[in-house]
């Protein structure tokens, strides 16, 4: 395959014959360089790319802001769940676009992005948080490579994380003693109690816990079915699907939690009588949850986690409880700590890792092993005792 160069006005151009489309000839012509020699070099490079890939690659001259907005509208909004959309939007608006708003997409080099990562590290940003704000960049630039073909390679593929101390990734485990302090502060009858004990005894995510309704509990078989979550979007509450397909699961629960739930159900029924027409009921209109004291001609959902007057709990309210536990009880806590604690206590006491994987709703065992199990003093002691108990002769 050959091509040609020519000067037109003050600019040099190169062109070559591409493959026929629908039997018609197609010729590609592009600006090559300032001189004939530069243009001939550009022609050779274009011909080499075309002969290898069957297509000519042209870097798109688009700004970072315009491209990321395009990616968000055409990929994220169409393919990602609401919480992912919200998190990506936050990372874009708070970190990525303010940093790179004056750049064109083609100028996002590995060096530039590495400097950004290093700067955030030196500012004290944790590894997990840094990963969370870089995730949309990885996805967006991957999309720019294909199917958009705006850039040839993803510069995020070459980024290296600075060395973090191993302890930085340690997760908080709530001891039995600390959990008792928490439930002493928020005893049965206070609205935080039920979501806290469900999280502790099941390892469910906060959105899964507040999404549980009474028809998800089988008091005969001692099971809970996790099949939906609650999410807040633009000050409205919606029902959504769990995080992944593997998150849809039915798990066994013990007699302790079962008894608490039975007691709570009776307590809820008493409150319905106590508040009468002032009790707040929850109805579903497709995915939207409507709270009303009136009897609406919509399907009613009896959620487990409600306040005394029937008001539905939201993730933000539970997060506020976590901050109070941190400040008032001096216990490092967030709701996800209950999930880490649940998994670790199970493994520590000999539970089968596959059972733990299913219980947590993970898609594979490695996630369970890498993320939610931790070496505790009890594990360390038992490991030592294994060798102590081995025969020496």
Where in the sequence are the language-model features?
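N-terminal DNA-binding module of tyrosine recombinases/phage integrases
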Residues: 8-13, 18-111, 268-300
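N-terminal core-binding DNA-recognition domain of tyrosine site-specific recombinases/integrases
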Residues: 57-60, 72-143, 149, 168, ...
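Basic, Lys/Arg- and aromatic-enriched nucleic-acid-binding interface segment
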Residues: 127, 131, 150-153, 157-212, ...
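Catalytic-site neighborhood detector that most strongly recognizes the C-terminal catalytic loop/helix
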Residues: 165-166, 173, 230, 341, ...
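A short, basic/aromatic helix-end/turn motif that makes direct DNA contacts
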Residues: 211-217, 357-363, 373
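C-terminal secondary-structure termini that scaffold catalytic or DNA-interacting sites
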Residues: 221, 234, 240-248, 252-257, ...
């Amino acid at each position: 395959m050959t091509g040609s160069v020519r000067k037109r006005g003050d600019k040099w151009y190169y062109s070559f014959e591409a493959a026929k489309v629908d039997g018609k000839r197609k010729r590609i012509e592009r600006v090559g360089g300032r001189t004939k020699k530069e243009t001939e070099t550009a022609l050779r490079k274009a011909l080499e790319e075309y002969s290898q890939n069957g297509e000519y690659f042209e870097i798109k001259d688009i700004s970072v802001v315009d491209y990321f907005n395009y990616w968000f509208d055409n990929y994220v909004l169409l393919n990602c769940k609401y919480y992912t959309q919200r998190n990506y939007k936050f990372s874009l608006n708070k970190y990525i676009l303010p940093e790179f708003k004056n750049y064109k997409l083609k100028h996002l080099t590995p060096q530039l992005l590495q400097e950004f990562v290093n700067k955030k590290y030196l500012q004290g940003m944790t590894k997990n948080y840094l990963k969370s704000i870089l995730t949309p960049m990885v996805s967006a630039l991957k999309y720019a490579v294909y199917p958009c073909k705006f850039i040839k390679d993803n510069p995020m593929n070459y980024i290296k994380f600075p060395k973090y101390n191993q302890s930085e990734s340690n997760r908080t485990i709530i001891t039995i003693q600390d959990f008792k302090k928490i439930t002493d502060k928020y005893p049965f009858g206070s609205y935080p109690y039920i979501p806290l004990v469900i999280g502790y005894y099941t390892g469910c995510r906060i959105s899964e816990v507040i999404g549980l309704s009474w028809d998800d509990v089988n008091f005969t078989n001692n099971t809970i079915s996790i099949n939906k979550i609650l999410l807040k979007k633009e000050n409205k509450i919606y029902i959504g699907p769990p995080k992944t397909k593997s998150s849809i699961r039915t798990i066994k629960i013990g007699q302790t939690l079962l008894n608490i739930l039975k007691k709570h159900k009776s307590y809820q029924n008493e409150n319905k009588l106590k508040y009468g027409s002032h009790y707040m009921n929850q109805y579903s209109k497709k995915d939207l949850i409507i709270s009303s004291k009136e009897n609406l001609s919509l399907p009613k959902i009896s959620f487990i986690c409600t306040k005394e007057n029937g008001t539905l709990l939201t993730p933000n309210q539970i997060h506020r409880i976590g901050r109070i536990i941190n400040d008032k009880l001096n216990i490092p806590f967030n709701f996800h700590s209950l999930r880490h604690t649940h998994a670790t206590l199970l493994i520590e006491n000999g539970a089968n890792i596959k059972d733990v994987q299913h219980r947590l709703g993970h898609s594979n065992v490695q996630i369970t092993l890498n993320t939610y199990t931790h070496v505790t003093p009890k594990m360390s002691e038992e490991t030592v005792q294994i060798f102590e108990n081995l025969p020496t002769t």
